[in-house]
Amino acid sequence: MPDEFQIDAALTPAPQPSQGRNESNDAALTEDLALAQLKDPDLSSDVFEQLYRNDSVMKSRKVRMAMASHQRTPRRIALRIVRELYTFELMQFALKPTAAADLKRIADELLLSRLSSITLGERISLARRSSTLVAEGLLLDKEPQVWQRALENARLTEAAIVKALRRPTGTRGFVEAVSHHPKWSVRYEVQVALLRNAHTPLAKALEFARRIPPRQLRDILHVSRLPERIKSQLRKEREVSGE
């Protein structure tokens, strides 16, 4: 299975565009002209309405993306377009700096809802390049190739790692990988989350426990899902060290 997929080749079918639009009288309008118009930051709502009614230009993925991410696009139009975007178009849209924050959130949620129906290769590609929210969701994928790529996503945050570690659906392989990861395993909050996780290896749990103040460690172990034998070992080591 290839590690990356070209966007055009990896498009996943989405709902078909709305049939409510009619052919515009402006048959001369081309993709290039529409894109040129959409570069105007002060475009009027009437122009967006005219463009949206033009079935010919709305077949263009570039035009749809430009309209959805334009700051002046009427929200009802932008929302309809977002709901019609293909999988990798949703990923691109969610990373657009000009797109409205609430619409980017919707795009992320649509992507998350499709994860169970897209291919392994597409999930691998998304894991490397998607937004923080989608990368966080892919940390819980059952396939190691997916969550391994998500761990290297440049947009992934410490908070996302901690949230994933708190979920009971995380795999043993994922937890062990985080506990050995050169970037994430040294983060204090990640270490605390690992000490609460049932799958953290004993050797790493001992290593992290040594860095936690005794009182806080007791509180962590009180709610930890680690096996009792490991928790007993951690407590015993603290007693031996006189802490």
Predicted features along the sequence, with ranges:
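Alpha-helical scaffold segments
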Residues: 1-243
